[in-house]
Swiss-Prot record:
Main function: Metallothioneins have a high content of cysteine residues that bind various heavy metals.
Regions annotated as coiled coil: none
This protein's name: Metallothionein-like protein 2
Keyword Metal-binding: yes
Family matches, as InterPro entries: Metalthion_15p
Keywords associated with the record: Metal-binding, Metal-thiolate cluster
Domain of life (superkingdom): Eukaryota
Family: Belongs to the metallothionein superfamily. Type 15 family.
Key word Metal-binding present: yes
One Pfam entry name: Metallothio_2
GO molecular-function terms, A-Z: metal ion binding
Organism lineage string: Eukaryota, Viridiplantae, Streptophyta, Embryophyta, Tracheophyta
Organism: Trifolium repens (Creeping white clover)
Length: 77
């Protein structure tokens, strides 16, 4: 997870989340717990499931944080 200005990580939909409290170059093995609520409504027609993504971005192939807590380049999916 990348850091912007040492206080936030690049989240989903190219928006910055609160993924980290500071830029640490070494591996940080601290425990983080998050909950995700999923609601699936099934009807008579075709079913469509929608899942909310967690606010995390990968360094390669995901978001990279630029200046002022903005994502650069914006390549989130």
């Amino acid at each position: 997870m990348s850091c912007c200005g040492g206080n936030c990580g690049c989240g989903s939909a190219c928006k910055c989340g609160n993924g980290c409290g500071g830029c640490k170059m070494n591996a940080d093995l601290s425990y983080t717990e998050s909950t995700t609520t999923e609601t699936i409504v099934m009807g008579v027609g075709s079913a469509k499931a929608q899942f909310e993504g967690a606010e995390m971005g990968a360094e390669s192939g995901g978001c990279k944080c630029g200046a002022n807590c903005t994502c650069d380049p914006c390549t989130c999916k």
